[in-house]
């Protein structure tokens, strides 16, 4: 079993100023190729701490991947840290210097002297070409038969180099991995785990649960000598999980909840009216071909022109089931869609956390409600997901699970 660790380097990552999307990408990539990731570390731009982290990682793992810290400035210290951890001395590589100078010349510029450190190499390192940036990576084979990979921080550069330069060099496991992720909605992770029972405690195939914004995911994975054998090993457990969770399932693997709604619409167009959710629902639907039109507003006068009646507004308020029903019907009538979906949400005041969603198909209406206090972003996200879940389950004639 090949063990891997990820070390993300950057004070901006440590303080949360930038989300570490690189580590998430690498974790998925490692898992898909049968490598076992057992630790992720985030460190600021500190030479001593990064050096120590590399040494510790090498004592535990076969593969250590560092992201970030390959720029030209004084606080870009990944090269120095790897060299210190391996007790090697970096020197300028003439070929890399020539490549960097040519890169700047092609852009009509002269290479700043500060960029010369990006041409450093240590004896055990091989330079990884960077086709979209100025920071070459490192591929290091240690005396202890371990591998260190250093990649730049910008995601576009890192992902390109990982696929084109790192993967062909990695000693990947010979055993094959087959994994399927099932998406559920309307059931909590603890209840789901109880239903799965002993399945979550077996090793191969393994069954694991993950809470996400759109519900709870269940990953079934098996490893074997061949892809076919791994698929066959996973199949009976996967079927059992599907049967156990059938009433909550909406998709698998790369499916999105918005995509599931599109499939359920079956070529019918969808109109959306949002009040209080700041376009959160429209953002999720933006790339879907059946998404016809939308209105995002909290202005009462505008909402009245879209179907909200003054009687409902004054008697029950904007954040009410009846208001959602009227606006869902209004999405059909005023936006010219075949199906209308509306969400009304309160993100502040006494009713903060309350939301109502409604779906109007022309033949029937369906509603669901939410009461989940949190910050404004969380409330809007939950309301948008609830609206999609309502649409998917109603259009496929499933029980609505708010």
From Swiss-Prot:
Belongs to the CinA family. NCBIfam families: cinA_nterm, molyb_syn. HAMAP family: CinA_B. This is CinA-like protein.
């Amino acid at each position: 079993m090949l063990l891997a660790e990820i070390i993300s380097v950057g004070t901006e990552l440590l303080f949360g100023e930038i989300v570490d999307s690189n580590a998430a990408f690498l974790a998925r990539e490692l898992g898909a190729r049968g490598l076992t990731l057992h630790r992720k570390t985030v460190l600021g731009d500190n030479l001593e701490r990064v050096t120590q982290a590399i040494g510790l990682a090498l004592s535990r793992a076969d593969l250590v991947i560092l992201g970030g810290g390959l720029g030209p400035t004084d606080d870009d210290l990944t090269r120095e840290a790897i060299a210190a951890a391996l007790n090697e001395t970096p020197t300028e590589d003439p070929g890399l210097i020539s490549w960097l100078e040519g890169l700047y010349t092609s852009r009509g510029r002269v290479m700043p002297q500060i960029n010369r450190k990006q041409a450093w190499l240590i004896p055990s390192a091989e330079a990884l070409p960077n086709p979209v940036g100025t920071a070459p990576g490192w591929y290091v084979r240690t005396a202890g038969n371990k591998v260190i990979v250093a990649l730049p921080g910008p995601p576009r550069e890192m992902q390109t180099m990982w696929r084109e330069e790192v993967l062909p060099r990695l000693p990947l496991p010979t055993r094959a991995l087959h994994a399927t992720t099932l998406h559920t909605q309307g059931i909590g992770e603890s209840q789901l785990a109880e239903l799965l029972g002993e399945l979550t405690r077996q090793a191969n195939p393994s069954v694991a649960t993950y809470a996400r914004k759109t519900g709870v995911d269940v990953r079934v994975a098996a490893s074997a000598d061949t892809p076919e054998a791994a698929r066959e090993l996973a199949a009976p457990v996967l079927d059992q999980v599907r049967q156990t969770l059938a009433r909550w399932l909406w998709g698998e693997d790369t499916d999105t909840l918005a995509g599931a709604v599109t499939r359920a619409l079956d070529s019918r167009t969808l109109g959306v009216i949002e009040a209080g959710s700041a376009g959160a629902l429209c953002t999720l639907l933006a790339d879907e071909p059946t998404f016809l039109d939308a209105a995002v507003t909290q202005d009462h006068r505008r909402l009245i022109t879209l179907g909200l009646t003054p009687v409902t507004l004054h008697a029950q308020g904007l954040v009410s089931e009846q208001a959602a029903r009227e606006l869902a019907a209004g999405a059909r009538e005023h936006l010219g869609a075949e199906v209308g979906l509306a969400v009304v949400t309160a993100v502040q005041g006494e009713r903060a956390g309350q939301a109502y969603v409604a779906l109007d198909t022309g033949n029937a209406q369906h509603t669901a409600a939410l009461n989940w206090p949190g910050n404004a972003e969380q409330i809007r996200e939950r309301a948008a997901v609830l609206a999609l879940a309502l649409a998917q389950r109603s259009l496929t004639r499933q029980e609505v699970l708010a």
